[in-house]
């Protein structure tokens, strides 16, 4: 076996045959290599065949040294201890030659599969791997819960689409989620793809989510850059409604109800004691009153907000392996139109139609209590029948141990 720098073609051919995270991609390499020159492709070859690969990026640390990050890599057969130890031992040598101070490694390796309430369905024994990496100097950072600004989320909510059609996926959802999706179609909620020049439309809705949940994530430039990095594998999607069309739809249904009510009133004149007719008339009158109210509300909305309402928007990345629901926002004033449900269904069907086997709702905190900061988000994802995947977490390898300690002291001083 030989530890080598890979060509772009060698890297691409290998990841195309393996399950990988979207950050381990040719798109990511192209952008970083062209714009920042801060990306490396390394791997292992045996008899000229690539058997391991990893995209690494670098950043400045302590002025003269570098910090490296593995972006959910490396991609290799972790059940092969000889290959695993060979890669990680030789990675240290490579990093030292690149003036690395330390590296953060976060393999895309499952620790547990759980149900939506956190109960373990399947456990993966990673103790041998952790011990092997520990002996090589890679320190496991523990099993984190919650969100972090310094590492990738360890808990993901995922919907399995493999060998399933739209009908099956809908049947497996919670009743209310299924009903909400159906209602978005009944109301005429539509979805369109936004151009990168329309990022501000997405970002305005995203900022509403930041305000609602009291967090600050990224600026508009970040989302524009992500669209450039994953230009052929990302989408900004907008759910919106044409209120004039919606009003006409309501008026048509209301007119039909009025005809039915008139017909029932005529029948009651002929048979005033018909309990069945009276019950039906009461029900239809209630429905008709509801439609009248909705028509008036819609007319008011048109007069104050205009004809088109932007309901919700989401940023997606997709690969051959997964569709990733990464960032989103919605206007809380228009929750009754349930734009977020329409967006999810649009991209779930996109995944099914393109034979992509996983719909990744992405991060949750891993705190399954009712007091968790993302309890509502978890319940939303649970409604789609998503399960939870808990990953192994981060490893840090100090390459220059003394200087790394100085780096940590300096970092902690700034935090205080």
Locate predicted features.
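A conserved beta-strand-loop-helix scaffold within acyl/acetyltransferase catalytic domains
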Residues: 3-47, 51-64, 138-150, 160-334
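C-terminal catalytic domain of photolyase/cryptochrome flavoproteins
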Residues: 13, 33, 40-41, 363-416
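Short amphipathic alpha-helical segments
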Residues: 66-72, 155, 187-189
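Short secondary-structure boundary/hinge segments and terminal tails
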Residues: 113, 151, 202, 369, ...
């Amino acid at each position: 076996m030989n530890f080598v720098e890979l060509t772009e073609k060698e890297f691409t051919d290998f990841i195309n045959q393996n399950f990988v995270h979207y950050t381990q991609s040719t798109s990511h390499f192209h952008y970083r290599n062209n714009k920042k020159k801060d990306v490396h492709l390394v791997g292992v070859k045996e008899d000229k065949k690539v058997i391991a690969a990893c995209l690494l990026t670098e950043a400045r640390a302590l002025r003269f040294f570098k910090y490296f990050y593995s972006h959910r890599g490396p991609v290799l057969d972790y059940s092969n201890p000889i290959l695993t130890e060979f890669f990680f031992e030789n990675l240290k040598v490579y990093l030292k030659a690149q003036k690395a101070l330390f590296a953060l490694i976060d393999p895309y390796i499952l620790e547990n599969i759980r149900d939506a309430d956190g109960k373990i369905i399947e456990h993966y024994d990673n103790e041998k791997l952790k011990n092997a990496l520990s002996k090589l100097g890679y320190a496991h950072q523990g099993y984190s819960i919650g969100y972090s600004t310094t590492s990738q989320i360890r808990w993901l909510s995922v919907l399995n689409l493999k060998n399933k059609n739209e009908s099956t996926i809908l049947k497996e959802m919670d009743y209310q989620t299924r009903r909400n999706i159906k209602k978005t179609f009944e109301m005429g909620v539509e979805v369109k793809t936004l151009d990168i020049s329309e990022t501000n439309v997405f970002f305005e809705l995203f900022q509403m989510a930041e305000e609602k949940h009291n967090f600050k994530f990224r600026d508009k430039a970040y989302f524009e850059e992500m669209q450039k990095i994953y230009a052929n594998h990302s989408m900004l999607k907008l759910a919106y409604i044409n209120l004039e069309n919606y009003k006409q739809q309501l008026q048509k249904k209301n007119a039909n109800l009025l005809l039915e009510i008139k017909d029932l009133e005529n029948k009651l004149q002929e048979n005033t004691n018909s309990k069945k007719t009276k019950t039906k008339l009461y029900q239809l009158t209630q429905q008709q009153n509801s439609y009248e109210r909705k028509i008036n509300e819609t007319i008011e909305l048109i007069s104050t907000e205009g004809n088109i309402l932007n309901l919700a928007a989401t940023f997606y990345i997709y690969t051959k392996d997964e569709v990733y629901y990464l960032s989103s926002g919605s206007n809380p004033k228009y929750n009754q139109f349930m734009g977020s449900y329409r967006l999810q269904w649009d991209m779930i069907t996109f995944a099914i139609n393109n034979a992509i086997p996983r719909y990744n709702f992405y991060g949750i905190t891993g705190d399954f209590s009712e007091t968790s900061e993302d309890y509502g988000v978890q319940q939303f994802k649970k409604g789609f029948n998503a399960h939870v995947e808990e990953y192994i977490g981060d490893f840090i390898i100090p390459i220059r141990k003394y200087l790394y300690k100085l780096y940590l002291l300096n970092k902690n001083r700034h935090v205080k």
